[in-house]
């Protein structure tokens, strides 16, 4: 079945083989050690380590090309790739050459590719401003949305209320990581600043009023099952609330988050939903339809 991928981080898609191509001094053992972690804080360190291997626009382009090829092989026809623009700026890399290289790769791909620029929430709103500005400048040129990721506890969504309002006024769609490693209050804050989709959001299951609000407002959760298990956001696969959220009527889209770091694919996430949680083929088909329904660019998604 055709699917769309709505929550995948470019920098989290870098396979070990690609890292070896980017840095010939690395060994597989070093890569394995650097990308091993036991909790969310450790995962963030691994994510930063991979980011630091991306030094040139051509490096980003290579990673994007490999990602698009893998997605195409899985039957993905539309993708919204999250680019950690905040990390690009933190590394003091010029953003324009990086984005231009990515845009060229996207244009070559048979998949429809759109971009979500992501700011680092724990760095604060002032540091996020340039990311939001870069996103607004590229509305209509591949960028469809802006969001915040990173450490929820050290970067609450309310800090970004003004930036989200300004982004919406400039034509950007809005997403926000929330309810991944912290409780329902984080999701309430994301909704309060205007988030139209919630990255992860699995802790919503703890708050009946929040579940009702998500249903009422038709705000989908971008659920990444393997990611949540690997980072310790849930204590075990059996404890993951994806099926309970689905049964309650919460809109859900399945995604991979960081497929290379979590050793998963979009196809394997659908298979996992069926195998571990009893999603039927009809329900999997509905999840696939959701992936297009909740895309930020309907023309590009529905047209595929």
Feature roles, as predicted:
Residues 1-172, 183-186, 192, 196-197, ...:
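Metal-cofactor-binding active-site regions of metalloenzymes
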Residues 177-182:
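Glycine-rich beta-to-alpha transition loops that act as phosphate-gripper elements at the mouths
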């Amino acid at each position: 079945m055709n699917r769309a991928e709505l929550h995948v981080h470019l920098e989290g898609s870098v396979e070990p083989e690609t890292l070896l191509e980017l840095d010939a001094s690395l060994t597989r053992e070093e890569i394995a050690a650097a990308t091993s972690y036991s909790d969310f804080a450790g995962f963030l360190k691994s994510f930063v380590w991979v980011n630091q291997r991306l030094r040139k626009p051509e490096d980003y382009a290579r990673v994007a090309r490999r990602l698009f090829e893998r997605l195409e092989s899985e039957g993905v026809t539309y993708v919204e790739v999250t680019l950690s623009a905040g990390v690009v700026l933190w590394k003091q890399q010029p953003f324009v050459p990086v984005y231009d290289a990515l845009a060229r790769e996207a244009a070559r791909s048979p998949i429809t590719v759109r971009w979500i620029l992501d700011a680092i929430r724990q760095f604060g709103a002032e540091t996020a401003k340039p990311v939001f500005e870069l996103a607004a400048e590229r509305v209509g040129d591949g960028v469809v949305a802006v969001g915040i990721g990173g450490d929820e506890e050290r970067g609450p969504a309310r800090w970004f209320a003004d930036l989200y309002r300004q982004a919406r006024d400039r034509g950007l769609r809005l997403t926000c990581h929330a309810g991944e490693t912290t409780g329902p209050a984080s999701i309430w804050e994301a909704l309060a600043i205007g988030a139209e989709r919630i990255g992860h959001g699995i802790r919503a299951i703890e708050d009946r009023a929040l579940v009702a609000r998500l249903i009422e407002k038709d705000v989908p959760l971008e659920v990444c099952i393997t990611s949540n298990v690997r980072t310790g956001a849930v204590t075990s696969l059996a404890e993951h609330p994806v099926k309970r959220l689905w049964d309650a009527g919460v809109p859900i889209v399945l995604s991979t988050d960081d497929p290379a770091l979590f050793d998963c694919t979009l196809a394997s996430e659908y298979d996992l939903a069926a195998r571990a949680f009893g999603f039927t083929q009809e329900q999997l088909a509905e999840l696939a339809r959701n992936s297009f329904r909740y895309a930020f660019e309907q023309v590009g998604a529905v047209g595929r």
